[in-house]
Amino acid sequence: NFTGTLSDFHHLYEENNDWLFGHFSYVSQTEKEKEKTHDGFDNIFFFQPQAVLILKKNILTIETINHSPEDVFHAILQQENISLKINNDQKINIRANIEKEEYISIIQQLRKNIHRGDCYEINFCIQFFAENYSLDPLETFKNLLAVSPNPFSCLYKNEHNFLICASPERFLQKEGKQIISQPIKGTARRDLQNKRNDALQKKLLSESRKEQSENVMAVDLARNDLSRFCEEGSVQVSELFGIYSFPQVYQMISTVEGIVPVNINLADIIDAAFPMASMTGAPKKKVMELIRQYEKTNRGIFSGTVGYITPKKNFDFNVVIRSIVYNAKTKSLSFPVGGGITWLSEPEKEYEECVLKASAIMKILGYRLPYLIL
């Protein structure tokens, strides 16, 4: 296991020739701290797995350190379904650390910041949380995927802290010399009961000036971040304003790609590009100051990144959103949500978007906010 600073990680990346799995918390770069974040996760944590299972097109490949792949496969077949005995009569009380009225007031203030030129776009988050509640992380993860299956999901454990993540967003992927980033900005609620209205929502999202302005700012930031370490002239936008379908929502996703020099170190890439453009804003330094000023809690692993590094130094990392952070020791959980704020933002609609993004998690927890229809 590894935990330490980014400079320490630089040596780990250079010296390791095996798989590594782990995370970078948002705080690891913004606060420059070595201590654990408020949610209990280390700022930076990576581990070398005992076994790696790769499933592609119905073909399972098993790589192991101390056991034969055959033994691991037979152990999987013999494994019984493990679940914790949780009291199903529990009542969960979910609260927000910023209530609706205060949220609207903060968005109005952020629009003033934008109007006077402090920034152009800022990602602002609120946190829903509950205390004294026990959950089974594995069952919760399976339930979350059933409601909201997404391509960058993960169930991740660091001591007694769990990340139950159904992320739709990729931060960075490196394959050989090519690196890509795929910022998401732009969300529309789907209507699966009415195909005509569902198609209309998709069309409105694709044509929305407000959503396009959010997206293009994230794209410009990603281009700037990648240009700091990619070969000169290699950074380009291969897709702009793509509309992708998910079970709950439509998302506007763009793809920025570039060519990295030989022997590029992941620590240098993280130093240049993290935190990601879609979870900060423009200009990045100023909006990170505003985030610290207006958000009520440090983000921790939320809006950080979880991923893996292959023995060939390729890697793939997500953006930690649409996630439950659960502390099994204190029996507390939280799930922050947010969105990009621009001058065109309407505070009431921004709040509705936050609730929409939280709805899948609230659904599996069996909770409805008393003053909102989800």
Segments the model singles out, each with a brief description of its role:
Residues 1-374:
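Extended alpha-helical targeting/anchoring segments
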